[in-house]
Design a protein with these regions (language model features):
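Catalytic beta-strand/loop cores that center a nucleophilic Ser/Cys/Thr
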Residues: 38, 44-111
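Solvent-exposed loop/turn segments at secondary-structure junctions
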Residues: 22-26, 93, 118-121
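Glycine-rich, charge-decorated loop segments at or immediately adjacent to ligand/cofactor-binding or catalytic sites
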Residues: 24-35
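Stable alpha-helical elements in mature extracytoplasmic
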Residues: 2-5, 28, 58, 128-132
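Short alpha-beta junction capping motif
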Residues: 1-26
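Short glycine-/acidic-enriched loop or helix-start segments at secondary-structure transitions
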Residues: 1-2, 27-29, 99, 123
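Extracellular ligand-binding/catalytic regions of CAZymes and related secreted enzymes
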Residues: 96, 106-143
Length: 143
């Protein structure tokens, strides 16, 4: 049922926002790999890590005017976003994928994937919230 709903979102050109663990939600679905832009397998995580977030594309509407920042979040040891993904945020944490946030197209839908957002230590960060807000607006075609 979920797979059918997601497939229909792409056909209806509805925006898709995937936050934190949602990126890894269906690792055995080939269609999910098409939506997120890589094989969503991971080999480990660690909660409460300090992550220095870097801006990969300072000209994208989601990241325009955003400066690099640090936040406390959960790290994921997983693959980086793949071909067809437009990388927005990165980090060099040794226990995390290099890619933190990216956009892509899935059929007619704009997709925004943002690995961050584990708990309140991340959510209190105003830059994290602003990037997420802009990501939602971007998927809706409003910026």
């Amino acid at each position: 049922k979920q797979l059918t709903a997601l497939t229909e979102l792409g056909e209806l050109s509805q925006g898709i926002v995937l936050l934190h663990h949602a990126i890894l939600a269906y690792p055995d679905w080939p269609k999910w790999q098409e939506i997120v832009g890589f094989d969503p397998q991971f080999s480990g995580y660690r909660i409460g890590e300090t992550i220095r977030t870097e801006i990969a594309d300072p000209d994208h509407p989601i990241t325009r005017g955003v400066e690099p920042w640090e936040m406390i979040d959960e790290t994921y040891q997983m693959m980086n976003a793949g071909e067809g993904c437009h990388v927005l945020l990165t980090c060099d944490h040794p226990r995390n994928a290099h890619t933190l946030a990216w956009t892509r197209q899935y059929r007619g839908a704009r997709v925004f994937c943002y690995q961050s957002g584990h708990d309140d230590r991340t959510w209190v960060n105003p830059i994290f919230r602003e990037v997420l807000r802009r990501g939602i607006l971007w998927t809706a075609g409003r910026i």
